[in-house]
Amino acid sequence: MVYSYSEKKRIRKDFGKRQKVLDIPYLLSIQLDSFKKFTDQDPTGERGFEAAFRSVFPIKSFSGNSELQYVSYKLGEPVFDVKECQIRGITYSAPLRVKLRMVLYDREAAPGTVKDIKEQEVYMGDIPLMTDNGTFVINGTERVIVSQLHRSPGVFFDHDRGKTHSSGKVLYNARIIPYRGSWLDFEFDPKDALFVRIDRRRKLAASIILRALDYSTQDILDLFFDRVNFKIKQDSLVMDLVADRLRGETASYDIKDAEGTVLVEKGRRITARHIRQLEKTNTTELEVPVEYIAGKISGQDYIDPDTGEVLVSANAEIGLEDLAKLSLAGIKEVSTLYINELDNGAYISDTLRIDSTTNRLEALVEIYRMMRPGEPPTKDAAEALFNNLFFSEERYDLSKVGRMKFNRRLSIDDDEGTGILSKEDIVAVMKNIIAIRNGLDEVDDIDHLGNRRIRSVGEMAENQFRVGLVRVERAVRERLSLGDLNELMPQDLINAKPISAAVKEFFGSSQLSQFMDQNNPLSEVTHKRRISALGPGGLTRERAGFEVRDVHPTHYGRLCPIETPEGPNIGLINSLSTFARTNNYGFLETPYRKVIDGVVTDEVDYLSAIEEGRYVIAQAIVELDENNRMMDELIACRHKGDSTFMGAADIQYMDVSPQQIISVAASLIPFLEHDDANRALMGANMQRQAVPTLKADKPLVGTGIERTLAVDSGVVVAAKRGGYVDYVDASRIVVKVDEAELTPGEAGIDIYNLTKYTRSNQNTCINQRPCCSVGDPVVRGDVLADGPSTDLGDLALGQNMRIAFMPWNGYNFEDSILISERVAQEDRFTTIHIQELSCIARDTKLGSEEITADIPNVGESALSKLDESGIVYIGAEVKGGDILVGKVTPKGETQLTPEEKLLRAIFGEKASDVKDSSLRVPNSVKGTIIDVQVFTRDGVDKDKRAVEIEEMHIAQAKKDLTEEFQILEDGVLGRARNLLLGAGFDEAQLDAIPRSQLLMQTIDDEAKQTELEQLAEQAEELKADFDKKFEVKRRKITQGDDLAPGVLKIVKVYLAVKRTIQPGDKMAGRHGNKGVISKICPVEDMPYDEKGNPVDIVLNPLGVPSRMNIGQVLEVHMGAAAKGIGNRITEMLEEQRELAELRGYIKEVYELGDEVQQRVDIDSFTDDEVLRLAKNLKGGVPTATPAFDGAKEKEIKQMLALAGLPTSGQLTLCDGRTGNEFERQVTVGYMYMLKLNHLVDDKMHARSTGSYSLVTQQPLGGKAQFGGQRFGEMEVWALEAYGAAYTLQEMLTVKSDDVNGRTQMYKNIVDGNHQMQPGMPESFNVLLKEIRSLGINIELDQK
């Protein structure tokens, strides 16, 4: 494999054995592609804005004299960029402008004669835009729209699993689900009649809907039944014989062939052998006794030719008397419905008998009454309602997906079709459910991923936009019918508010629009790849059963079987598998390699769950020879959802990679194959909660996906084009682009500005640091700067810690963790958290609130950290209770006593008419102010601090743009200089020419002169561009802010808090091995090895066997080897050994392993590259053991041997306190530990006195309210059982809701008198009031 310059800085040793056929696709494509389809112009009009506009327009007036037509749309440019929107707290969006055409028709002339046409561009609201990383900025916060897994439109057949009826009889049902519109259900009742429901309302006989579709009783019978024809003879009947129909019946008479030979005796069951005999003798007619027809059902009306009287009506039972009547009337032939118990039930016939309607109108009225109970039906209303239900394109849409699923399920060849239902569709569904009831077809599996599809952000936004458009449509139609249209323009007809409101509601408050989980890069990526079955149109937690939540065979390679939340949402929220993607219909598909005659090709096909069922698919772990031919005779494979063994020749596809079944988070767990799934689930979920540490540390034992994830998450800065690094500082990287990648006429400079110390959604710190040096060559995709939780482009969520598995004085009881003081001293798990605190000055009824340093009754020391505007300085160290922003609020006027009036006259007005409402630091918070932002309403005077901040921002913007301009100008001048050097000028001449004159030189060579003139033009453009950019920036900074109504000023203060690790913090490994720190132990007391090196963390060995996550033990062994090799390399460097020896050792490390795919050609590295690689490997050789394809025990032992460590992975340790050796050897190695975002500082809380609930007078609950601990029912029982009467009295009175008692208690404590006088708790008064509210008077007699 060829490595770039930056990749050679540190290479991860990969133990993967399988050939990589397919790179992991871009991880955020599900979000970006979906939204791109929504916003991109689509000439076909099948999706996005175009589809929404075409579905609603043209809007015609009620009279038909005018209409509003849609022409085209344009999405403008956003006013503010993403960062500005986040700072200002506004939505990152772009204006949507639509060109509409208003057409007026001439009433007097022929229909369709145009009188006037007006075209105009109309503003239709702002549409939130997606950022490059797949998020939306709504009101200043980053949000993610989670994709939804919902039931695909189409037709589904199911049954109730015998739960509806007490007999346990299975009742079948069918449901037609459209994309928009009414649901249509068909269902059997226990008596086997077929019923229909519309939108889950009251059920009607299914034949009613057929009558409403204009089918008569005769038509219905013809549609659903075959006929049996009888010829009437003197004393018998002759039946037309279809031999197959007799199978399974019991002969009620002797069955004879044409010659009179008895084939089946009376009373015998007719078998397949008898049928074959009948067919052999070509028997087409059979003489049967007259009694045979009794009870059979007539297939048509029989009318007396003379009188016109109906002798036997269709669907009526024929008796012997009826037969006599027919014979008398001269009717020679009778046809009955072919019905048998086995596979041809009389379901529709029974249904027709229940049905009280006889014609179309009655059926329509019946449907109208069911849909609109209480309204008097009219013919037109009933007809309109029925048509609008399923046959109107405005109200009903199956969608392309729905039509495709519908047609495939009912075996209709064409996948295309209309979005509305037809008569034939409804009949086909009824025929199919009857076939299922007859045992001729199967019900569907609704949890199959072929029946569930993904609705992504673009589709949901389009639906919401359409909802807004429909609201506008109603208003437009009314306006077109009223008023003088000659004077109106399209602008006057359209009100953009309903559209904006619908879109805003979706992005702001939909259940699927979620506050982005921004703990670390992994949590961001996972959130964007999440698939939820909840949300509008989906399931609810309470209703979802076990089947929906369970892992289904079709999840393979599509949804991760491991990563899902624990708790009520388990199985309802899933994660997309690593290689999965959605197809055009929204179904999930996964890639497979094609196999032809046992030979695996490199051709990759993406298959959906439906397609996959048709093929035989082998796993990725199949052994292949050098020609990619399968070596085993029998191969484990999957077919139609079952696992089986088949020969190599039968295999049609093979998995692309062993990791394709799991999600990104699960594939970050090394040795995943050795962990129990429950613990792996916890491991995958806890990695998302890891807080970025101060100094990121790459995992020594990884899986090889770390770099892909870090780059795709967007937290690192990756090179857009190749070149070399020209300039680096903490906030900017400049890359000079290679000539080969330049587009003609550009400066050839790429500038990357880095994000510095900004706050994430979870209050963690986002900071980017350059990881390249000036002069480094870069290629496209190389990592130039690390973000949070990344180290040299690798995802680094935690720290590599030296672990020992042993008990230590009970401090690791029940998963507790003992850590060394050294870990805290070295700041290994120190994290920075940034809090945003806001102070809002409002306009109140009594006057405006004011931000000022002049605060009543506050001492000088409390104001020491504020400037003259009353806002805290940047860099100030603050603690709980300190004032950050001084604010005073006007107080209501009260009647003053003469004494107060005198005091006011002496000391001035100020003190009494305002109260202090300053922003203070929350209790138990201590940190440093790192930034202050002031937002002032338009028209309100800016204070001194606001002006200073503004000037600072302008100066910073000017500096940035000037530097950017100079870099680009230097690039242009550098190319001009090279051009002049090639045209006869020498260095000395060029040095003498001033910079400004360099581009004005003349050259004899015409081509070069033209090029020089082009460069001069370019320099001019750059200057003009710089001036324009600066003016835009300046205007944005100085303009007033658009604040909420009534808000005059907002001050945002950013506080950085440094959190070191301490007892009570939660830590975890990657295998679900979590615990809480019990003690930070001095280094000298920690167990140490024979060389005197102490361990960092002691874990309880009992945490491994019962939890079955053995992966952690293998990780510790591999980590020990990786670190040991790093120590050997460090020794070589310190002893300044020969470079050849170092190169040889490193080569030996990378070549270890028999079937390993990775090949690192260390011989091709230069001496400098080898030295740089060795320096980066001093901390340990990072290794990769991919899931299901990782390092074997033998390879771990080889690595340990190479590191000079015992191959058992165990060492003899000594007790740090006594110096004595422990009895047995201990497993010691390196494990990657994470510090989770459950910090003791956020949870620890104590209360003495504080606020009380107004009604109950009991202390509030929770840390946020500075509340107390609940002393509940069971705790009272405990004190009662113990007999601690006085403690109990104290708990129930002065410590709870005895108002007078607690006031007295406070005074007593102040006076040093430690006694209490309990009174009556307030809860008695509450009880009194509750009883009185029931109308019962109850009073307390106080004696």
UniProtKB/Swiss-Prot annotation:
Alphabetical GO biological process terms: DNA-templated transcription
InterPro entries recorded: DNA-dir_RNA_pol_bsu_ext_1_sf (IPR042107), DNA-dir_RNA_pol_bsu_external_1 (IPR019462), DNA-dir_RNA_pol_su2 (IPR015712), DNA-dir_RNAP_su2_dom (IPR007120), DNA-dir_RNAP_su2_hyb_sf (IPR037033), RNA_pol_bsu_bac (IPR010243), RNA_pol_bsu_CS (IPR007121), RNA_pol_bsu_protrusion (IPR007644)
E.C. number(s) listed in UniProt: 2.7.7.6
Highest rank taxon of the organism: Bacteria
Catalysed reactions, semicolon-separated: RNA(n) + a ribonucleoside 5'-triphosphate = RNA(n+1) + diphosphate
EC top class, as a word: transferase
Any GO molecular function: DNA binding
Gene Ontology CC: DNA-directed RNA polymerase complex
Record key words, sorted: DNA-directed RNA polymerase, Nucleotidyltransferase, Transcription, Transferase
Subunit structure: The RNAP catalytic core consists of 2 alpha, 1 beta, 1 beta' and 1 omega subunit. When a sigma factor is associated with the core the holoenzyme is formed, which can initiate transcription.
Function text: DNA-dependent RNA polymerase catalyzes the transcription of DNA into RNA using the four ribonucleoside triphosphates as substrates.
Family the UniProt entry places it in: Belongs to the RNA polymerase beta chain family.
Protein name: DNA-directed RNA polymerase subunit beta
Classification of source organism: Bacteria, Pseudomonadati, Pseudomonadota, Gammaproteobacteria, Alteromonadales
